[in-house]
Amino acid sequence: MNASVEGDTFSGSMQIPGGTTVLVELAPDIHICGLCKQHFSNLDAFVAHKQSGCQLTTTPVTAPSTVQFVAEETEPATQTTTTTISSETQTITVSAPEFVFEHGYQTYLPTESTDNQTATVISLPTKSRTKKPTAPPAQKRLGCCYPGCQFKTAYGMKDMERHLKIHTGDKPHKCEVCGKCFSRKDKLKTHMRCHTGVKPYKCKTCDYAAADSSSLNKHLRIHSDERPFKCQICPYASRNSSQLTVHLRSHTASVLENDVQKPAGLPAEESDAQQAPAVTLSLEAKERTATLGERTFNCRYPGCHFKTVHGMKDLDRHLRIHTGDKPHKCEFCDKCFSRKDNLTMHMRCHTSVKPHKCHLCDYAAVDSSSLKKHLRIHSDERPYKCQLCPYASRNSSQLTVHLRSHTGDTPFQCWLCSAKFKISSDLKRHMIVHSGEKPFKCEFCDVRCTMKANLKSHIRIKHTFKCLHCAFQGRDRADLLEHSRLHQADHPEKCPECSYSCSNPAALRVHSRVHCTDRPFKCDFCSFDTKRPSSLAKHIDKVHREGAKTENRAPPGKDGPGESGPHHVPNVSTQRAFGCDKCGASFVRDDSLRCHRKQHSDWGENKNSNLVTFPSEGIATGQLGPLVSVGQLESTLEPSHDL
């Protein structure tokens, strides 16, 4: 069969074994749109129509199809038939050699063989023939019909229908496990991986695995240190767009409107190439970002200075501190949290999952921030510096506790006595004294202690430094070594005053002080004097412990830290501007007041009578440092970069 293509029809000839030449002219397939019912004989026009979206129009009336058989033969034709059929008719029967046409293709069933050559011209469409419609332009984009929405798509009505579910709130796809609903089926499939634990997308560099490809792409930027999202106002760059969106809120609205524009003086191609990796802000996004940059959300509770530019969600999370709302509850220990991410971190305590591991040792942490703090131990990095003394710490919480040494803030107070502490762990240990509980038991004897430190001291004194030859027990290794010399056979060093002998000249010099009347080591608090510095240190520790702490004195025989020493902690004189409205306690720093208020919410209102209030002014006595402003003590605990 020789076929040629001319326009939208196909013609050709076929030699039938009976000697009859059949000329066949067929119309191409007609494609019908399933939404608007338009007919297309051109496949390219049909594809362009589906991609650009279709408009619901009235389906044109289909004209009846006409099939005409024209016989051209050398001898008189036996029969010439002209048949008019409707578009619903698909079966054709002729008296000449019979042809059955199915779906635009032809077959022939000869009924008889003859020598006469007959040429039959057949013109038959496979479907209803209509006027060829004009294909919509391929560049046509559908716009959202909701006012104020600038969404446009060139991917047809299905994509537009998915977008309209955002406005209508339609979420037909529901999770069978947790009941969460989604507007798109692919979102539901990705969500189901949270329940099944399937993470098909794995990192080739480390053990990271993700449930979707976008999370893996974000993770790969950590290894490559790629930061494609750049701020057009400052040198800031981030690995994902959400971080850049949050960063843009820190800029004011005026800076956004003036600086986010395309740089002047650059060609169009060069300017577009320069802005390619950055986030392109639409007019609506600029207005929304400018509004967020202008508006600051303040806490409405009196005395709270919390401010945020990150929207109402951030403010709602903060308000839970005041309201005490903790909607997220642990299933194992019934502990409640105000934020879901805190509950997720807490759950790792029960599951023992520690995904963040140190590459220098065997340490593993449940969160990345704990791992960063641990890595500073290896690098000995101390970015948090005190502005009043040379003290530096590895994390902000240590610096916060250290600043209370300057200010004298003790926000953690005992409800049963007047004891006050700088950190909560000290208060917890103190409360065991009132309860009479002794949870720490010695494994060598029946002694029980209220604190773990007391148990360690007991084991060190009673069960560690024992003499192998007698029942002697020393407090430390030095006592045991000194005693062990008594069991040695050779004592070359002998005292000229008595029968004392030893093997060490230094021990003999110490012994010689027994015979002399000079007592050079004297106590500053009483008339006690001694010949040995260790005896004076024991005396001060037992009798004058509180007085030594008040005056910040070093043990006798050791040089105390100078004014510029790393352990020098001067007190400061400043007004206690942050006062508690429930018990009258006042503090220098706001964080101390927050810790104090948390005690009220934890213990209840019926225990406020036992609170010990602070004086309204600064420390009256013992001022060792200069006058310090409150602003200097309220400085944010940001790491210092001048290490």
Curated annotation (Swiss-Prot):
The species this protein was found in: Mus musculus (Mouse)
GO molecular function: DNA binding; zinc ion binding
Purpose of the protein: May be involved in the regulation of mesenchymal cell differentiation through transactivation of NOTCH1 target genes.
GO BP of this protein: mesenchymal cell differentiation; positive regulation of mRNA splicing, via spliceosome
Domain of life according to the entry: Eukaryota
Coiled-coil zones: none
Gene it is expressed from: Zfp64
Keyword Nucleus appears in the UniProt entry: yes
Lineage of producing organism: Eukaryota, Metazoa, Chordata, Craniata, Vertebrata
Record GO cellular component, one term: nucleus
Protein known as: Zinc finger protein 64
